[in-house]
C-alpha cells in the first residue's frame, strides 16, 4: 500500500461500492455521513463514521459527527469515555482505502490502566507516566 492515493483516502475518488469494507450494519446517517457498526469491534458499540462525499470538508463532518455522538453517549451515561481515531497509511495499520473515523466506547474497568489512551497503539509507549 505504498500508493499515496491508498494512504490518503480523501485524495482519491470516493468509492460508492463498499463491498469488502470493514463495516456491517448501517445504524445512522445524515446528509454527509453514514454510521456503521465495526465488523471487528474493539469494545461494544464501536462505530465507523464514513463520509458520503470525497472532500476534506465532509471528512471533517465525519469527525465532528463522531464527537457529537460520543458526547451524547457520555451525557446519557452509557459510556464513561471514548477514543476517536483514523488509521492513515500502512505503517499506521490502515487496511482499507475507504475514509472513516473510528469511535470506540470506553467503560471504567475495560482495561486495568487506560492512562495514555490512543498512545497504546505502541504498547511500550502507552503509559507515558511510567
Residue ranges and their predicted role:
Residues 1-130:
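HIT superfamily nucleotide-processing domains
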Amino acid at each position: 500500500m505504498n500508493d499515496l492515493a491508498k494512504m490518503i483516502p480523501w485524495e482519491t475518488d470516493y468509492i460508492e461500492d463498499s463491498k469488502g469494507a470493514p463495516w456491517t450494519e448501517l445504524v445512522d446517517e445524515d446528509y454527509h455521513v453514514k454510521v456503521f457498526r465495526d465488523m471487528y469491534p474493539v469494545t461494544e458499540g464501536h462505530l465507523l463514521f464514513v463520509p458520503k462525499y470525497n472532500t476534506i470538508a465532509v471528512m471533517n463532518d465525519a469527525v465532528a459527527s463522531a464527537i457529537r455522538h460520543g458526547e451524547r453517549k457520555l451525557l446519557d451515561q452509557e459510556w464513561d469515555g471514548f477514543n476517536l481515531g483514523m488509521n492513515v497509511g500502512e505503517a499506521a495499520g490502515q487496511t482499507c482505502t475507504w475514509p472513516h473515523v473510528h469511535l470506540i466506547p470506553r467503560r471504567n474497568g475495560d482495561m486495568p490502566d487506560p492512562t495514555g489512551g490512543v498512545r497504546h497503539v505502541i504498547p511500550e509507549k502507552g503509559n507515558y507516566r511510567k
